[in-house]
Amino acid sequence: RLQTLVVQWPKDAGAWLALSWVLRQQNQPLRSIRAEAESRAAQYDYAAAVDRLRAGQDMARNSPNRNDYYEASIIDTRLREMQSLAKEQAARK
């Protein structure tokens, strides 16, 4: 299973991207966006990860589905982490 794979290999960008596609097909757009962000982060493209996570925040805010609460919390936490990494990355350039 892809979810098990990304837990074991969190830097596997391809697995995250495949998981994103599967989640989109399963009508889980918020989880799909987070998986896409994780794929970007695995490629060290933290700015793109921040962009995807912000899109996820916007989607969560506008979603009538309250079941997305836990995923929204994960997105908020990961966004802070990615913003910090993006800032460090920009400082090194």
Task: Write out the residue ranges for each language-model feature.
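Alpha-helical adaptor scaffolds
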Residues: 1-25
